[in-house]
Amino acid sequence: MRHIFSLLSIVCLMVKHGACLTLHQRDVPAVVSLDIKRSIVSDPVVRDRVRRKRDKTIGQTLDNAETLYFCNVTLGTPGQALRLVLDTGSSDLWCNAANSTLCSDSNDSCNISGSYDPSSSSTYAYVSSDFNISYADGTGAVGDYATDILHIGGSTLRNLQFGIGYSSTSSEGVLGIGYPSNEVQVGQYGKDTYPNLPRAMVDQGLINSNAYSLWLNDLESNTGSILFGGVNTGKYLGELQTLPIQKVNGRYSEFVIALTGVAFDSESHHKTYSSDALPAAVLLDSGSSLTYLPDSIVENIYRDLNVAYEPSSGVGYLPCKLAGNNINITYTFSSPNITVMIDELLLDAGDLRFRDGARACIFGIVPAGDSTAVLGDTFLRSAYVVYDIANNEISIANTNFNSTEDNILEIGVGPDSVPSATQVSHPVTSVVADGSGARIGAPTGASSTTVPSISSAGALSAGVARADKQYLAIALIAVWFVLGL
């Protein structure tokens, strides 16, 4: 699919030793474009808890799995193919070793994501045995740090440091592109940072500034793109507005910004929610399938939409037939407003149905419990986001869904930050965020929230049984509802 969607998949990341950014437009911008692609995940809440070119931009097409986004790279000499989860919420690239406990089992657990065999690469070099990543539910991987050659988006990075999982409970490798201060060896052992992927692109001259932009496109699209070192003005509406990233425990380590307002709109009424939880610190995390908001806000949204909420799993359900209705949730960040249509919030739940026979869809907003709120893919699909690590800023605009237009601008060095973006006047910064370290996915408190069942989850039934593996988990939950266990 990558060649089909190459026009949709350019992400600019240009890094130049922590300096500010200026607008550059030329025939061959310094960007690297990477395609990202979608892949189906049967239970996004459980999955979230598990994972919490001289052309100086580098772009990559992303696979859109409805709930997760993947990119294809090769590692080593000769290249070994890997499919990695794109994750802005962590900072290490890691993959499973071919002889790991997981990949060596009889279930072919690593067939889809691929694995890495150090002994088969002539450019492999051992670094340390400090790789030890864990996620909110206790899963993770333990192994070594190493360096090797990475081929990504038509560009080559030499001596890139990455993690190899020899003992692993996660079959999915990860392409972490967050702050270096969130790397495993920093958080686990207090060691110095190393140049992770975006930083290495700067150091090796592929891009000019440590920044990239992300365009996931809509739920129906198979692909999106990440553009290292630049922005693609054809992929968003209006203008980019720039906000400061908030410090976590006194340092810049995660993409946390201040959410100042949430509103509900339908054909019959408009409601702006008031809550003591606002303004709230929210983490922008492409590795989270769903969006996790403060409980009081979620309760209001669920009440207005009559969501059927099942507390033990932390999942809300709505009739799939609501897709296409004029219902929106709007998020405000001091000044910028990002509007998410109901179509982008209804995820396939297989054959799960309400008792009246209507198909049930997973609702893409769930309660955060006691943890920091997370704006995951059910938000990010509706936003074009520039992650400016060099200047500790986020630039954001409403996405231009299914755009075939490309206008790539290089992020250079200078005082003006992101190309064509304007600074938000007097942005809210009085929010407190607690860091969770390297993770992909849901807040740990999501399953024990006090949000009530606005509509009885017992209204759900199993519908017509299917044997498809991707629907098995949800079908079992549905049966559990029916039996009243």
Curated annotation (Swiss-Prot):
Domain Peptidase A1: 69-397
GO biological process: fungal-type cell wall organization; proteolysis
Protein localization: Cell membrane
Main location: membrane
Topological type in the membrane: Lipid-anchor; GPI-anchor
Enzyme class: hydrolase
Highest taxon above the source species: Eukaryota
Role of this protein: Probable GPI-anchored aspartic-type endopeptidase which contributes to virulence.
Family to which the UniProt record says this protein belongs: Belongs to the peptidase A1 family.
Protein name: Probable aspartic-type endopeptidase opsB
Organism annotation: Aspergillus fumigatus (strain ATCC MYA-4609 / CBS 101355 / FGSC A1100 / Af293)
Lineage: Eukaryota, Fungi, Dikarya, Ascomycota, Pezizomycotina
